[in-house]
């Protein structure tokens, strides 16, 4: 075991080395995520001219176009099997009697943009009936799309693997799809027209590492399906990709389900739209706009949520904490102007009050908090904010004029009565006597000053002295995990603030500090992988466990940060219950285990990358109960995995214990 530098945010990602991304082409496109409408979710591979005209006009009539939804894309089903004698691709004249150039002009006359759809294989997705793809015809097709007046190209991945005789789908091709997409990108960029290029190869070969060089967005995973469960699956796949987002390069979580009849409830639609927005996914409506229910149209038209997506800073929100047993999780990220956006998802099937502890998103105080869907604005939020969140709903909050985590200005958090100053709403991530308290005075002391410090959990007051000529002093204090601690300071000169730092954690390496039961084993990774330890526990399951004996200075609840590895990507299983997650249980002594369903962590290709993505660490934190002073037994396993979760737990690199 060894000491580990404390983490500032409650949960972060550990990234194994990845090749540096080259700058996106400076073509001025997609400086913020693209927005629009696509035929597929509502009409599948059966679009026609009147469908596109009606929905395009509805974009304008409803005001959606003015809000930014401008790319109108005709997805699969628009073409024919044979090319023209000159080799050019063409549209189905029965479905689009006026033709695609006329369609482009129609959309442009409405102030919209024309999105076309192609495929990097020999046929388009949705065949049969067979519709020709662009493989081996990239040059002529790129020129044709430009001549039609296209403003964007969604480029798909069906019928593309030559080595296996061009099957409809191959999630494990023998070669990367990268060269095929790069080839079309090169020809698109050669046109005398700006065309936004959307890479749609379903997350195969971890496109976040190569797609930003050739396209403006890339699909992070398989198609979204018309079920609530697909939201969890998609978010789990997004976790290791959020930091790849930026102007001109956006992870695409796939089209929106909002507005599709009978698919999602209103709270579910709010959750879906909120998370796609703050993760900086392109926002592409997939439902029919004419006749859409008012609640769905209102969600898609929410100017605040759209603004979060289109924020000029261009930084995605990231997963901060996940409470699997309690059924909720927190995502957050920065916005322009020093603001913060946060989303708390209620995965349970019931309405309930949920509390957001601001330190979980790196904050201690917000002068203003806007609860978007509750239509509520609160001033002076200290440490925590609670609100009722509907079943499968989301608490989406924007925080402004904030103070960073661990900093407690006296004029906000303290009350003074004569020579006694008490700070309330003090947050502790863990129960420990080893928090570092720094007290800052309003001015330098003229003489040495003796003060007394009392906390809720300390058995005796702490007496210390502020030296003459000093304006601050530090000492260790004891706090209890939670957001309701108080710190009382007696006999102190006027105070400016206090600052609290968590205890320095002790790190326990999975492969070295744990005793393993078969079939679990230890695996040593190459240099600079399986961070921070360079090794990991593998094959933890419902039938095996890893046990460590850990000394604790106090009893109570302890915060742990778990460095895990999971790259079990849900490709075929995405159509069913595949969730891109693995289940881990953490048991302290004889207490009930805490369950943590971890997302993907892989940041390299699952087909060709180092370790196939199984050397890339992620990190999530959990609060565990039942610790005693002295020696504790900590057991990692997958208890209950046979009851609907995956059999195997994630690989475990190690655990940091905050004591």
Swiss-Prot record:
Localization, UniProt: Secreted
Variation of activity with pH: Optimum pH is 5.0.
Residues bearing attached sugar chains per UniProt: 48, 86, 130, 183, 438, 450, 484, 551, 583
Pfam families recorded: Melibiase_2, Melibiase_C
Keyword Nucleotidyltransferase: no
Originating species: Emericella nidulans (strain FGSC A4 / ATCC 38163 / CBS 112.46 / NRRL 194 / M139) (Aspergillus nidulans)
GO MF: alpha-galactosidase activity
Gene Ontology biological process terms from the UniProt entry: mannan catabolic process
Residue numbers annotated as active site: 156 (nucleophile), 223 (proton donor)
Listed EC numbers: 3.2.1.22
Keyword entries, A-Z: Carbohydrate metabolism, Disulfide bond, Glycoprotein, Glycosidase, Hydrolase, Polysaccharide degradation, Secreted, Signal
Function as written in the Swiss-Prot or TrEMBL entry: Hydrolyzes a variety of simple alpha-D-galactoside as well as more complex molecules such as oligosaccharides and polysaccharides. Active on paranitrophenyl-alpha-galactoside but not on raffinose, locust bean gum and gum guar.
Main location: secreted
CDD domains: CBM35_galactosidase-like, GH27
Catalytic reaction(s) noted: Hydrolysis of terminal, non-reducing alpha-D-galactose residues in alpha-D-galactosides, including galactose oligosaccharides, galactomannans and galactolipids
Disulfide bonds: 125-158
Gene: aglD
Positions contributing to substrate binding: 201-205
Protein name: Alpha-galactosidase D
Enzyme class label: hydrolase
A cellular component annotation (GO) from this entry: extracellular region
Temperature dependence per UniProt: Optimum temperature is 52 degrees Celsius.
Family: Belongs to the glycosyl hydrolase 27 family.
Segment forming the signal sequence: 1-20
């Amino acid at each position: 075991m060894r000491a580990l530098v404390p983490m500032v945010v409650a949960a972060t990602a550990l990234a194994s080395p990845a090749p540096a991304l080259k700058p996106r082409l400076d073509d001025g496109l997609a400086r913020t995520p693209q927005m629009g409408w696509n035929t597929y979710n509502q009409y599948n591979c059966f679009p026609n001219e009147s469908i596109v005209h009606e929905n395009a006009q509805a974009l304008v009539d409803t005001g959606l176009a003015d809000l930014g939804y401008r790319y109108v894309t005709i997805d699969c089903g628009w073409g024919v099997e044979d090319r023209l004698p000159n080799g050019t691709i063409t549209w189905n004249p029965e479905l689009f009697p006026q033709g695609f150039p006329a369609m482009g002009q129609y959309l442009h006359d409405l102030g919209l943009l024309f999105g076309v759809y192609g495929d990097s294989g020999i046929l388009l997705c949705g065949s049969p009936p067979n519709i020709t793809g662009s493989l081996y015809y990239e040059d002529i097709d790129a020129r044709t799309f430009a001549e039609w007046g296209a403003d964007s190209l969604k480029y798909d991945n069906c019928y593309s693997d030559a080595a296996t005789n061009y099957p409809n789908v191959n999630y494990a091709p023998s070669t990367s799809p990268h060269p095929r997409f790069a080839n079309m990108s090169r020809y698109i960029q050669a046109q005398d027209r700006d065309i936004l290029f959307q890479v749609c190869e379903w997350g195969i070969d971890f496109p976040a590492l190569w797609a930003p060089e050739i396209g403006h967005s890339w699909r992070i995973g398989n198609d979204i399906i018309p079920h609530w469960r697909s939201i969890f699956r998609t978010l789990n796949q997004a976790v290791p990709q959020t930091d790849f987002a930026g102007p001109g390069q956006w992870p695409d979580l796939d089209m929106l389900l909002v507005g599709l009849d009978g698919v999602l409830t209103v709270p579910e639609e709010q959750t879906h739209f909120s998370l796609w927005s703050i993760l900086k996914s392109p926002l592409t409506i997939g439902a029919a706009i004419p006749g859409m229910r008012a609640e769905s149209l209102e969600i898609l038209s929410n100017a605040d949520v759209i603004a979060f997506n289109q924020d000029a800073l261009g930084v995605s929100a990231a997963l901060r904490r996940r409470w699997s047993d309690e059924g909720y999780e927190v995502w957050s990220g920065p916005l322009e102007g020093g603001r913060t956006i946060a989303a708390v998802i209620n995965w349970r099937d019931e309405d309930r009050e949920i509390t957001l502890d601001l330190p979980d998103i790196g904050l201690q105080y917000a002068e203003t908090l806007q609860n978007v869907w509750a239509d509520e604005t609160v001033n002076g939020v200290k440490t925590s904010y609670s609100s009722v969140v509907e079943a499968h709903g989301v608490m989406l909050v924007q925080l402004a004029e904030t103070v960073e985590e661990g900093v407690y200005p006296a004029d906000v958090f303290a009350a003074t009565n004569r020579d006694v100053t008490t700070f309330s709403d003090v947050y502790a991530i863990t129960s420990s006597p080893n928090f570092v308290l720094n007290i800052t005075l309003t001015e330098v002391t003229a003489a040495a000053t003796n003060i007394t410090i009392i906390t809720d959990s300390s058995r005796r007051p702490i007496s210390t002295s502020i030296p003459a000529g000093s304006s601050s002093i530090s000492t260790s204090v004891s706090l209890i995990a939670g957001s309701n601690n108080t710190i009382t300071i007696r006999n102190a000169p006027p105070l400016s603030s206090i600052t609290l730092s968590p205890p320095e954690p002790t790190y326990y390496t999975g492969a070295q500090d744990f005793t393993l039961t078969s079939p679990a084993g230890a695996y040593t990774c190459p240099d600079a992988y399986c961070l921070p330890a360079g090794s990991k526990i593998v094959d933890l399951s419902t039938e095996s466990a890893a046990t460590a004996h850990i000394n604790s200075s106090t009893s109570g609840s302890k915060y742990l940060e778990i460095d895990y590895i999971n790259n079990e990507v849900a490709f075929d299983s995405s159509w069913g219950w595949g969730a891109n997650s693995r289940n881990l249980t953490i048991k302290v002594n004889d207490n009930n285990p805490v369950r943590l369903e971890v997302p993907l962590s892989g940041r390299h290709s699952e087909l060709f990358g180092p370790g196939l993505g199984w050397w890339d660490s992620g990190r999530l934190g959990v609060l565990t109960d039942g610790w005693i002073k002295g020696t504790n037994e900590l057991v990692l396993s997958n208890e209950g995995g046979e009851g609907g979760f995956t059999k195997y737990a994630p690989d475990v690199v190690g655990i940091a214990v905050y004591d």
